[in-house]
Amino acid sequence: MNISIPQIIAAILNFIILLLIVKHFWFDKITAVVDSRQSEIINKIEDTDKNQKLALELKEKNELELGNAKKQGKTIVEEYKSKAENVYEDIVKEAHEEADRIIKKSRLEAERQKKNAEEEIRAEAVELAVLVSSKTLEKTIDDLEHRRLIKDFISKVGI
């Protein structure tokens, strides 16, 4: 194959003419598409950077809020634990007080029953003493005088 100088010059001229035609009709459109695509890519990269920074800020904020929530939860648990312990202590205190009241009431009731029993025993002792003494003396002293004598005797003896 023989390549001559006029062929090379013709090829270069054809290329320049083709380049001028392409530049005249399509170069602005191609440049606009490339520029718009380039600006889209730059905008997306900037948006991605902004979103990444925002995500990091939100992550830090959420971690801080989570830490605060944990602290508040712990505080609330401690507060309710303290309240529960106070309620427990109040219940135990009330139970002891109630037990003391019941014991005191029972002691008073026992003393009252003891006094009633002593009174009944005294009354029966007086009756028995009157009966025994009237049988042994075979004479009748008036009943009131006899009771008085027996009560004096019992009080001296200590029944």
Curated annotation (Swiss-Prot):
InterPro entries: ATP_synth_B-like_membr_sf, ATP_synth_b/b'su_bac/chlpt, ATP_synth_F0_bsu_bac, ATP_synthase_B_chain
SUPFAM superfamilies: F1F0 ATP synthase subunit B, membrane domain
Any one GO molecular-function label of the UniProt entry: proton-transporting ATPase activity, rotational mechanism
Primary location group: membrane
Subcellular location: Cell membrane
Signal peptide: none
Bilayer topology annotation: Single-pass membrane protein
A Pfam family this chain is assigned to: ATP-synt_B
Parts of the chain that traverse the membrane: 2-22
Keywords: ATP synthesis, Cell membrane, CF(0), Hydrogen ion transport, Ion transport, Membrane, Transmembrane, Transmembrane helix, Transport
GO cellular component: plasma membrane; proton-transporting ATP synthase complex
Function: F(1)F(0) ATP synthase produces ATP from ADP in the presence of a proton or sodium gradient. F-type ATPases consist of two structural domains, F(1) containing the extramembraneous catalytic core and F(0) containing the membrane proton channel, linked together by a central stalk and a peripheral stalk. During catalysis, ATP synthesis in the catalytic domain of F(1) is coupled via a rotary mechanism of the central stalk subunits to proton translocation. Component of the F(0) channel, it forms part of the peripheral stalk, linking F(1) to F(0).
Family, per entry: Belongs to the ATPase B chain family.
Subunit structure: F-type ATPases have 2 components, F(1) - the catalytic core - and F(0) - the membrane proton channel. F(1) has five subunits: alpha(3), beta(3), gamma(1), delta(1), epsilon(1). F(0) has three main subunits: a(1), b(2) and c(10-14). The alpha and beta chains form an alternating ring which encloses part of the gamma chain. F(1) is attached to F(0) by a central stalk formed by the gamma and epsilon chains, while a peripheral stalk is formed by the delta and b chains.
Protein's name in the database: ATP synthase subunit b
Organism the protein comes from: Clostridium botulinum (strain Loch Maree / Type A3)
